Amino acid sequence: MTTIFETLHEIGAAREEDREVYSEGTRDRDDVTVYRDRRSGVIYIDGFYGGDEVYEEGGYREKNLAKSGSRDYEIARDAERRATAYRPFVCGRTIVDFGCGDGSFLRKVQDETLSLCGVELQRDYVEALNRDGIRCHTSLEALENGSLDTAVSFHVLEHLPEPLPVLGALRRVLKPGGTAVIEVPHANDFLLRDLSCEAFKGFTLWSQHLVLHTRDSLRRLLAAAGFEAIAIEGVQRYPLSNHLTWLSSARPGGHKSALAALDTADLTNAYEAALNRIDATDTLVAIARNPA
């Protein structure tokens, strides 16, 4: 199996001589070292992968929505944001959500698409979606060549030890000229790069996240997979209240506390725009085209 470092090296986003230890351990494992490429800024874990079984069983998730039936606030909020932001690529289109989780995005847009399906490893999620009338497969191999207008994948790519073959499979199922929308966490997150918030660093580094990309490394990866017309934009998932709580109390959840009263639409949009100016959003989104 190719390691994520080998892939990063192949695309010119990491070199052995530029490797430095970023953290001795992650939030869930003391035996996993996290590295940073001092030249590119990419953050990565080399030589570790928990295995597909972890994702099939779903034990790594902090909440199992298929069992609890609850609607996690962050997941619901993300689904709403994505449905609005990516509507031009979804409305009236045939789409697949690769790594769809409990299907929050698919459920949100199902009345707007021409057809839709999900791909997900976690077995109970697959069963629940199929039971609810949303087609869900465990592999892209179930989908025909050139059959879809749009492929979306939200916070999945960073989990993959070999992302290039997966991106190639996404290209295979897309029609010529089809669109891929890829969302990943950002190595230049304001709390990490600019504020050096150790509490947040200890929380956000996770053995399941094998890489935190920069704009450049994400663009290189998609280009290496054969995509073209690649546009990268920054998105801020967590608002000012969240950052204030990390800085004042060294804990997550500020966006669900009394401080959330600060997060008016105007302030939230302005904060995201300000972070974009310095390339410090917590999330990157790539929108890319499959060659015609």
What are the functions of these language-model segments?
Residues 125, 188-190, 236-239:
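Feature marks short, surface-exposed loop/turn motifs that line or immediately flank catalytic pockets
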Residues 182-211, 216-221, 242-246:
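Short, glycine-/aromatic-enriched active-site segment of Class I SAM-dependent methyltransferases
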Residues 1-146, 150-154, 163-169, 234-235, ...:
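Conserved N-terminal segment of class I S-adenosyl-L-methionine
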Residues 154-161, 183:
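Short catalytic micro-motifs in class I SAM-dependent methyltransferases
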